[in-house]
């Protein structure tokens, strides 16, 4: 039986539902716990999506190990106040309580949980890939972030969530697009409107910026300029494979972007610092398969969420 490792960026699962819940577009759920009625709306819907991932891969006959990565307040925010300043929908105390409950339930159900002060889920995901990719036959990252595509390989794929999805409204499964080394170039070139190559996503964001995270990049450097830059690198026979390493991206920027001037080099390197995943040590805890039907039942039935057990 092939062993599949699912690495899940939790934050988007919660974000996906919270706006609909607050707008009254989702049915409110509750149950009695120790004689007290508890609102389980914010707990149930993210867990429902989460468990659907496990069920899908198990239905294909895979042995599934799951790791869930949670955001903490990022050190990057202290380095640059504009970083992710465009993110709306700030969480309140009710949200934080729900997220903590979800994390506890996932842990009790036997899943691998990762969270580290000052680090984002992306940092933890990157470290899990670097350390444990070879422990499994294949790894799938569930994320909305294109940054993670620098880790695509023969053994790593991505299920990328995009708001609105590719199918019917509300159809969660169809709002994830499978991205692999085989379809990356076509998929991202269509999104970014330029000739993007495998392993060049970090270089692109360092030069052109990343609007989703409020990272500016080089002033005036857009998709057309990136195409010209790639043509220049092609002529030089550049090895794009090494650009999975931020250190190699930095070296290339220092060697090849100087024609735009010292300011452009500084802007690109500053953007790279914000994009680069930070080193972490928390994931030294090796991901193992420890979940079971019995553990899920014990965890989820505290809140009478029977549909999540099987």
Kindly label every feature range from the protein language model:
Residues 8, 144, 221:
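Single, functionally critical "micro-switch" positions that shape active/binding sites
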Residues 2, 56-70, 85-91, 111-112, ...:
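Non-catalytic nucleic-acid-binding/docking modules located in mid-to-C-terminal regions
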Residues 139-145:
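Conserved RecA-like ASCE P-loop NTPase motor core of nucleic-acid helicases/translocases
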Residues 2-138, 152-175, 276-281, 291:
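Noncatalytic, basic helical substrate-engagement surface that gates or grips nucleic-acid strands
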Residues 146-147, 153:
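Acidic, divalent-metal-coordinating active-site segment for phosphoryl/phosphodiester hydrolysis
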Residues 123, 149-150, 227-228:
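Alpha-helical elements of the RecA-like P-loop NTPase motor core of helicases
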């Amino acid at each position: 039986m092939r062993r599949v490792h699912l690495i899940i960026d939790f934050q988007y699962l919660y974000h996906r539902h919270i706006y609909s819940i607050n707008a009254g577009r989702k049915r409110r759920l509750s149950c009695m716990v120790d004689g007290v009625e508890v609102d389980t709306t914010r707990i149930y819907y993210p867990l429902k999506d989460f468990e659907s991932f496990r069920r899908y891969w198990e239905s294909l006959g895979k042995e599934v190990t799951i790791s869930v990565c949670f955001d903490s307040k990022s050190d990057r925010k202290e380095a640059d106040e504009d970083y992710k300043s465009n993110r709306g929908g700030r969480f309140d105390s009710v949200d934080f309580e729900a997220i903590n409950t979800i994390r506890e339930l996932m842990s009790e159900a036997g899943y691998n949980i990762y969270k580290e002060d000052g680090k984002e889920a992306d940092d933890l995901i990157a470290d899990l890939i670097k350390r444990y990719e070879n422990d499994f036959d294949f790894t799938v990252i569930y994320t909305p972030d294109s940054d993670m595509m620098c880790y695509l390989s023969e053994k790593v794929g991505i299920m990328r969530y995009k708001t609105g999805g590719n199918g019917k409204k509300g159809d969660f499964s169809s709002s994830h697009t499978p991205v692999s080394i085989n379809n990356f170039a076509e998929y991202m070139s269509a999104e970014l409107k330029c000739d993007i190559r495998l392993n060049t996503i970090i270089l692109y964001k360092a030069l052109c910026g990343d609007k989703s995270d409020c990272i500016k990049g080089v002033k005036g450097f857009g998709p057309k300029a990136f195409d010209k830059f790639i043509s220049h690198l092609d002529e030089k026979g550049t090895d794009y494979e090494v650009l999975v390493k931020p250190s190699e991206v930095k070296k290339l920027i220092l060697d090849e972007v100087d024609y735009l001037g010292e300011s452009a080099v500084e802007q690109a390197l500053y953007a790279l610092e914000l994009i680069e995943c930070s080193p972490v040590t928390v994931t030294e805890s090796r991901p193992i398969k420890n979940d079971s039907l019995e553990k899920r039942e014990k965890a989820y039935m505290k809140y009478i969420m029977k549909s999540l057990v099987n």
